[in-house]
């Protein structure tokens, strides 16, 4: 019987831990966890996403601050805001919503956030800490951190002897996911668009993670029977059966057919997606604990 991971349920349990840790930190040291979100411009999707982050932060008991700047904001003004947030001791996490409007240089802004406040885990310092196995002081990018919660809950903390294949080598997901699996003692292969015999490589995986943005690319005959399959893809495809011009969301994995082979699988939607905001909250409360000299919670 295949287990379909309910991402909303797992995310809710992460949020519960965040709430408890936030309250305990405030009680023990008087520190209220603080998250600042910066959004530039008026992209509706970005505003919706930022709104949900702000609501979740308040629900967790955080001090939640949103800075909304016009689309024509100058680079130096945005940099000055980030510098002020870096210097603000009541803010433990800073998130700049991407993409930024042109011609703003998003990379320069992201790298200017103090690594200990970089709750998106995108700074080169945090990437370097992950690459060297320093999970004690680094912050991990939210989506791979969330996918890793699924892996740990399925296989435990130690992945010794298990083969993991990550399809996708992006800095945002593929590389950090591979590092997390490696840190947990898995034997890791990173596959990508230039990989030969991709299906054959995937068939060797006890843990298969797909993150390439190719709708339903991973078929049943790519998957080792009994494998754990984590689908990070979010693709919108035509769904004429539901009406003219209608679309539906699918992952990088052909869910129905792969479900018949895998032992554990994440759906799209409702799998990895809900974990991203949950892990943003987790990173923020971890950052607050470190600043206060307290041991952060484990997720």
UniProtKB/Swiss-Prot annotation:
It holds the Pfam family THF_DHG_CYH. It comes from the Bacteria. Pathway: One-carbon metabolism; tetrahydrofolate interconversion. It catalyses: (6R)-5,10-methylene-5,6,7,8-tetrahydrofolate + NADP(+) = (6R)-5,10-methenyltetrahydrofolate + NADPH; (6R)-5,10-methenyltetrahydrofolate + H2O = (6R)-10-formyltetrahydrofolate + H(+). One of its GO terms (biological process) is tetrahydrofolate interconversion. Belongs to the tetrahydrofolate dehydrogenase/cyclohydrolase family. Homodimer. Catalyzes the oxidation of 5,10-methylenetetrahydrofolate to 5,10-methenyltetrahydrofolate and then the hydrolysis of 5,10-methenyltetrahydrofolate to 10-formyltetrahydrofolate. This is Bifunctional protein FolD. It comes from Rhizobium johnstonii (strain DSM 114642 / LMG 32736 / 3841) (Rhizobium leguminosarum bv. viciae).
